[in-house]
């Protein structure tokens, strides 16, 4: 789903990676920060960006690992860096890394890593806290991506795309019902995320699949599907 302002940011990240010629086999520069609210799809974005960077670096089978800051605190950093040599490490909830982990990772990044790409993903405040107390570590992250807050139209577009990818289609009244569900969740102190829309869509899909025998027969006869043989999600599937 095209997201407002993301294309420009991605172009910048790829361009910066191309221009970064002073890694000298290490991870001392050219690493990436991904900032966004909980449930905004940071990890999916991180994996896509890593793949794009690896393609640009002409790495055919670059290794990629995803780990949380908490889990990394219990691991041997040297071993992880050595296993992922030349690949990428995506650290979710990076703000949960403790001081010792940050220091060890910082040192490991200055050694021969095969130019391993490190991606930290986190919400703004915990990431700012982590980096402000570790300035040397912060300098190694020269690119950043900010996942924007989605407006309702973008969230509905995501819902439609998600439905299509899973063999479903939302009819016009169903789209209005989806807008209504999203609107009910939006509050001054809470912004609706992609993860929440995915939940709404999963519920609607589950509801349409739990139809009785009569409706299954109807669908077999061609009703309740569109020309591309996708099952139609309608208003009643969202009003549950």
Region locations from a protein language model:
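AAA+/P-loop NTPase substrate/partner-engagement loops
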Residues: 52-84
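Pre-Walker A (pre-P-loop) alpha-helix and adjacent loop at the N terminus of AAA/AAA+ ATPase modules
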Residues: 1-30
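Conserved alpha-helical scaffold flanking the Walker A/P-loop in AAA+ ATPase domains
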Residues: 71-111
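A short helix-turn-beta junction within AAA+ P-loop NTPase domains corresponding to the substrate/partner-engaging
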Residues: 132-150
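Walker A/P-loop
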Residues: 29-61, 141
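Conserved nucleotide-binding/hydrolysis micro-motifs of P-loop NTPases
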Residues: 71-73, 95-97, 123-128, 150-155
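C-terminal alpha-helical "lid" subdomain
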Residues: 162-169, 176-240
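Conserved catalytic/switch belt of AAA+ P-loop NTPases
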Residues: 97-138
């Amino acid at each position: 789903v095209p997201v407002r302002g993301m294309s420009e940011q991605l172009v910048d990240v790829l361009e910066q990676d191309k221009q970064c010629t002073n890694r000298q086999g290490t991870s001392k520069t050219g690493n990436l920060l991904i900032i966004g609210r909980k449930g905004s799809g940071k990890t999916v974005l991180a994996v896509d960006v890593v793949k794009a960077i690896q393609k640009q670096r002409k790495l055919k089978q670059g290794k990629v690992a995803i780990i949380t800051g908490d889990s990394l605190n219990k691991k041997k950093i040297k071993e992880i860096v050595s296993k992922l040599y030349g690949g990428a490490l995506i650290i979710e909830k990076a703000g949960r890394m403790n001081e010792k982990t940050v220091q060890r990772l910082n040192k490991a990044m200055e050694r021969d890593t095969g130019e391993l790409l490190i991606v930290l993903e986190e919400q703004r405040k915990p990431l700012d806290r982590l980096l402000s107390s570790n300035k040397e570590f912060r300098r190694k992250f020269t690119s950043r991506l900010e996942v924007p807050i989605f407006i309702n139209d973008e969230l509905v577009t995501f819902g439609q795309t998600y439905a299509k990818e899973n063999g479903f289609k939302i009819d016009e009244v169903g789209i209005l019902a989806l807008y209504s569900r999203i609107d009910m969740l939006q509050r001054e102190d809470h912004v609706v995320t992609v993860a929440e829309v995915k939940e709404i869509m999963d519920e609607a899909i589950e509801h349409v699949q739990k139809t009785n025998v009569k409706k299954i027969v109807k669908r077999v006869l061609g009703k309740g599907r569109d020309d591309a043989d996708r099952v139609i999600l309608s208003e009643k599937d969202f009003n549950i």
